[in-house]
From Swiss-Prot:
Matching InterPro entries: CANIN_dom, FAM178
Subcellular location: Nucleus; Nucleus, PML body
Organism of provenance: Homo sapiens (Human)
Subunit organization: Forms a heterodimer with SIMC1. Interacts with SLF1 (via N-terminus); this interaction links RAD18 to the SMC5-SMC6 complex. Interacts with RAD18; this interaction is increased in a SLF1-dependent manner. Interacts with SMC5 and SMC6.
Function per UniProt: Plays a role in the DNA damage response (DDR) pathway by regulating postreplication repair of UV-damaged DNA and genomic stability maintenance. The SLF1-SLF2 complex acts to link RAD18 with the SMC5-SMC6 complex at replication-coupled interstrand cross-links (ICL) and DNA double-strand breaks (DSBs) sites on chromatin during DNA repair in response to stalled replication forks. Promotes the recruitment of the SMC5-SMC6 complex to DNA lesions. Plays a role in SMC5-SMC6 complex recruitment for viral restriction.
Biased composition (Acidic residues): 602-619
Protein name in the entry: SMC5-SMC6 complex localization factor protein 2
Motif (APIM motif): 137-149
Extra remark: Localized in the locus associated with inherited infantile onset spinocerebellar ataxia (IOSCA). No mutation were found associated with IOSCA compared to control subjects. The expression level in the brain was not different between the 2 populations.
Tissues of expression: Widely expressed. Expressed at higher level in skeletal muscle and at slightly lower level in brain, liver and heart, than in lung, kidney, spleen and thymus.
Family: Belongs to the FAM178 family.
Amino acid sequence: MTRRCMPARPGFPSSPAPGSSPPRCHLRPGSTAHAAAGKRTESPGDRKQSIIDFFKPASKQDRHMLDSPQKSNIKYGGSRLSITGTEQFERKLSSPKESKPKRVPPEKSPIIEAFMKGVKEHHEDHGIHESRRPCLSLASKYLAKGTNIYVPSSYHLPKEMKSLKKKHRSPERRKSLFIHENNEKNDRDRGKTNADSKKQTTVAEADIFNNSSRSLSSRSSLSRHHPEESPLGAKFQLSLASYCRERELKRLRKEQMEQRINSENSFSEASSLSLKSSIERKYKPRQEQRKQNDIIPGKNNLSNVENGHLSRKRSSSDSWEPTSAGSKQNKFPEKRKRNSVDSDLKSTRESMIPKARESFLEKRPDGPHQKEKFIKHIALKTPGDVLRLEDISKEPSDETDGSSAGLAPSNSGNSGHHSTRNSDQIQVAGTKETKMQKPHLPLSQEKSAIKKASNLQKNKTASSTTKEKETKLPLLSRVPSAGSSLVPLNAKNCALPVSKKDKERSSSKECSGHSTESTKHKEHKAKTNKADSNVSSGKISGGPLRSEYGTPTKSPPAALEVVPCIPSPAAPSDKAPSEGESSGNSNAGSSALKRKLRGDFDSDEESLGYNLDSDEEEETLKSLEEIMALNFNQTPAATGKPPALSKGLRSQSSDYTGHVHPGTYTNTLERLVKEMEDTQRLDELQKQLQEDIRQGRGIKSPIRIGEEDSTDDEDGLLEEHKEFLKKFSVTIDAIPDHHPGEEIFNFLNSGKIFNQYTLDLRDSGFIGQSAVEKLILKSGKTDQIFLTTQGFLTSAYHYVQCPVPVLKWLFRMMSVHTDCIVSVQILSTLMEITIRNDTFSDSPVWPWIPSLSDVAAVFFNMGIDFRSLFPLENLQPDFNEDYLVSETQTTSRGKESEDSSYKPIFSTLPETNILNVVKFLGLCTSIHPEGYQDREIMLLILMLFKMSLEKQLKQIPLVDFQSLLINLMKNIRDWNTKVPELCLGINELSSHPHNLLWLVQLVPNWTSRGRQLRQCLSLVIISKLLDEKHEDVPNASNLQVSVLHRYLVQMKPSDLLKKMVLKKKAEQPDGIIDDSLHLELEKQAYYLTYILLHLVGEVSCSHSFSSGQRKHFVLLCGALEKHVKCDIREDARLFYRTKVKDLVARIHGKWQEIIQNCRPTQGQLHDFWVPDS
């Protein structure tokens, strides 16, 4: 028989190169020659019909039979059949209008015999024995877009394993199996009456084409691993290609709707997809039985059910269907055994679960090693405190590489041994994981699901211990995540690491197996919901599995949250779905499935809530609400009935809080009135305390004892409180750091003689000669100041002597102008003109300097009283206050009427004006040293010392004062004669010891005259403070040190206190001094000691001493330690004592330094201490 086909590649008769398209012809010429013996040859009509069908488009009948689980012993070739549609296979169910074909024994069908003949010839041509054909798993590969797919054929357990499993069935399962067998026998009897040989041939032929296409797709992914296999006829490739093109168009139309529904209601998607898998599981065993018995009468009923819900399935979930292929007789093709629906479901379940486990376990015959294997392709994410596992999207190369690894014949036997245990364990793991997976569920459903999971866990601990080693966590769903990483997780901890070797084997068998398992639980719940109480627990585990494994991910990628699970043996409740699988007949199961589908499609969440609440007979643990209610002394029994598990936490908590008895509150009118009175009393007390704090009467301090208001403040204190405050009060302000100062300036008298508005250059009697002078004289008062500050006067008198009236006007304006900037600018102009006038060497006239009267008039106009300017009676100037006023009035006589009522020009201390006057005086005393007489210099020195006592000048560095004092002391002609007079005059400027110390420290000590004045002034002040007679101050330093030793002995604090007490008693009429006055006198005594010690330091440390004075300093050190240091008794409450003792230590250190720097006397190497005589 001649066959027309394309020539095969040399060297590779049947297998194309990897990556190439499958050849048009799948059988070589003469390929059947080796297998012709005992085989029936094909007729030319059959071959012609096959060629015609090759170029025809695939019919609907071909498409809906692609997933048919028909048995086939043919090995197909081909390579990488790409599916670019929805990445899956979906059945197109047959129309319910088709008549049921008559069942005919398969061995009598001519088409099947011709097809089987060609296949056997094809296998014998390549020398591959049928027994060595790999057993393909019952699973489908869920692929990413654009990847390849293979649809492996099915396998079933050996007869021995099946009989072994039947031995362990419970009585309930045997009973259900018996009912199923009876129902199936009735279906077969009804099917015989509707037989039609012509329709039977059509249906059988369509089944063969569908099964061939599925097997072809499965073998195409295995072509790279089995290059010796030859391809089959191109008819089945064309059918599969046309199916894929149609699925591509359908996917594009449904993609947007599926993504929106998937993102909005993932729970509904999961539920609907589980229902879809349930329909497939219900349909596939019946297809197997129809293949064995040719026709099953109940086919149209199941097709009606599937067609009725097909549109709703597609709208609520992504189009992913786990496909199953093959039958139980895949390994034994010569045996055709008729089984009941329950037997087929049982065998399919037993053969599927081990293969699902084999996808994440290494294929080893040794059982113990399988426990330590792990799931792969899991990506870890931690969005919260829950571990999140996601499946990484597979690469196209990974799909085909993992196909051959999971198809070894030995896997069937190894996996079948653990089928029942693995099924239950996967249900338990899926139940716990799914309840943590759905974050969109209501809070009540999440809590109920968690409680049910704990109940299942408790029930598992009571079952057999043979299954307690491992609870394998199945791979849940593939999530395309490019950035995910592989995470190893042990099965016992729900940790599922993978080796890199098994990276390509992930989701094909697991997704299909667990989805089908979930469907079986759902069917069982629909059939035996009211009969068996254990079914509800199976419902609980099956429902989450449906939503967990049946949720496909496109966009956004679905994620799985996994909580650590504890391995425990499977509970009997987990076996309930499998044990009750055979109960009921097929018609009753079909009607129950319809009702269940309708109920689930109406409301998925209500269905889940009903499933969770249906477990009433199961032993339950204490709920969280019951434990929390114990805090309120309340139990669920007290409320009448426990809250339903489906209610949320809010409703449960509100139920329990409603039974808590509130406390009794007696709010009477008397209590309200009492509270108001207490509030008013507290408000008044708070106001009183705030007022006392504001007035400084918050704490009664003994510091103010002796003051006028101290007695009033302490009248309200008890005696014991007074004693307590007096005992523990701390006095820290007895010795201030700064001198108290005096009020020298009276700002109300400022501007009494003149101000910036009355000073006019035109009233000075000046007659202008130059153009600039005439311009200034023609200008007003404001313009005169402007021209002066802009440099007109400086340029006018650059080469000419400046007239005295102009200089005097500038000096007065500088001292009285309220704008400090203008005052500084006038000072600059005045100093520049004065310096320029001094450069004229040919001029016989000295530059102008202000006279003592001009200086006194300026300070008097600032607000200083005339008696303060010249405080000493024996040192008075030649003028008086009236002269200053009259002189100024003559210069401003014309404007006196206009400014008869003057106002103070200064409200604060004019420190800028004061310093400007002092600076100009310093310049004048430097340029013209002989400008002042000695008497005038002494009056100026006393004036400066008095002005420095101003309180507001304490914080201002008086460097300009010291500079002027140096010039004035330098200009004194008879210095030695004037020093004692100057010291006695300064000593009279103040009566306060600290002010006098300030005057001593104001004297500059960096000149010889300054140090001398400082020493003499210190001795004079010390003698005054110690009430000694004023003696002539010796000029020699040796005599001064000797006098100092005599004064130092009298500086004992106790002696000073006695003198003060005696003086105070003399002033008191009764001569009695209380303790408070004694404390004040003690403070004054230590304060005086502090000042005296500073003055002693100024006397001794002002300049360097010779070796002849060394013995005097040795005496001073001994007197200081003996009379002062030893007399001070420090106290923590009396800080002033510590302050005085610290000063004693510093002075002693300085004297020791002077002693060390002085050389010993002539002829002595060492100094020895000589006791006082």
